Amino acid sequence: MAKNNESPKKEREKAESDLTEKVLHINRCSKVVKGGRKFSFSALILVGDGKGRIGYGFAKANELTDAIRKGGEAARKNMISCPTEGTTIPHEVTVQWDGASVLLKPAPFGTGVIAGSKVRAVLELAGIKDVMAKNLGSSNPINQVKATFQAIQQLLTRDEIKQRRGV
């Protein structure tokens, strides 16, 4: 609800201002036409607040700035929440997406994020401070990010596990 006579739109803009945007991968494609080469760009963008909310967006455009802007908008629409236990994840999880497999393991306090560059970026923007990750298989950044998001979505807190077991 709106507080202190602020509109819901202003509240949403304020919440979005807390988000950090990171360009993870840019690809330039060229098409040979009669007049020469025509370039187009694709961009993979991450958006996170460092408090457990993270999103990614993939967009294409003829101009690089347009691809980045569209990717950021797609990332904001694709936000998910990440369950944490303190500074780490609740349990170990392995996920395969296309050719990429990602293994996430909880780590003790003070370990830091031990992961490859693309997986590390996702985990850091999600606000996870202590985790070990291993990327197996494909090194395609898009598939790595999608596999990492699948892994994050499969994470359950202790309370959710207890509810499922009926304890």
UniProtKB/Swiss-Prot annotation:
Gene3D superfamilies: 3.30.160.20, 3.30.230.10. Pfam families: Ribosomal_S5, Ribosomal_S5_C. One of its GO terms (cellular component) is small ribosomal subunit. GO terms for molecular function: rRNA binding; structural constituent of ribosome. Residues 19-82 form the S5 DRBM domain. GO terms for biological process: translation. Keywords: Ribonucleoprotein, Ribosomal protein, RNA-binding, rRNA-binding. It comes from the Bacteria. Belongs to the universal ribosomal protein uS5 family. HAMAP family: Ribosomal_uS5_B. Part of the 30S ribosomal subunit. Contacts proteins S4 and S8. With S4 and S12 plays an important role in translational accuracy. The N-terminal domain interacts with the head of the 30S subunit; the C-terminal domain interacts with the body and contacts protein S4. The interaction surface between S4 and S5 is involved in control of translational fidelity. NCBIfam families: rpsE_bact (TIGR01021). This is Small ribosomal subunit protein uS5.
